[in-house]
Amino acid sequence: MSLNMPFLKYNDNKKIRVRPDFTICLVLAVCVCIVYGQVHDFEFTNYDDGDYVLINPHIKDGLTLESVRWAFVTNHASNWHPVTWLSHMVDIELYGMNPGAHHLMNVLFHILNTLLLFMILNRMTRRIWESAVVALLFAVHPLHVESVAWISERKDVLCTLWAFLSIWAYMNYVKTSRIVHLAASLFLFCLGLMSKPMIVSLPVLLMLLDYWPLNRIPVNKISTVRDFFR
């Protein structure tokens, strides 16, 4: 009996070896853990964490009908992002008011985002090592410290997750032309909007990806549009 393990492959001598993309994903996850594992010892901050979790009665109640309703109708903290509120409520249900666990959830989302970025780039370009380098920069770049190490910035890592999943679904649509994949991409985009509105620019990004590397827009059509505006 043989086991189907997609992260393994056989060489010409029938010897098992681990696929390089699986190894890269493992290394990327370890790098994120090395850089951000320390957040487990961090506390809540006095900047926005109170509004988002610490003294927010709707969040502290966890997943109740009233709290869920509140998440979809409130513009508390000058934001409408019900999915972000719901994620904080789920944290309360799972970990209570343990700040380290809330921080580690952000780290988990960042790991998922890093792996998704690598898989998206590798799938689109078929350049595995260049994709790995870009994903590594994304994983450990200091610009992401605020988004990962600050509980109130859950909306950033959550929005990014939906954006990458939406791109992946769109790539499936490009490959298969099945409308279900396009609908999935749109649904994930809507979840991103309900996490943080900055994802609103995603359709423009998809158009750019259509040009390169998906090559769905021929160069001659770009020239025609350019000539029209001359």
Regions found by a protein language model. Give the residues of each.
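Polytopic membrane enzymes that build or remodel cell-surface glycoconjugates and lipids
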Residues: 1-230
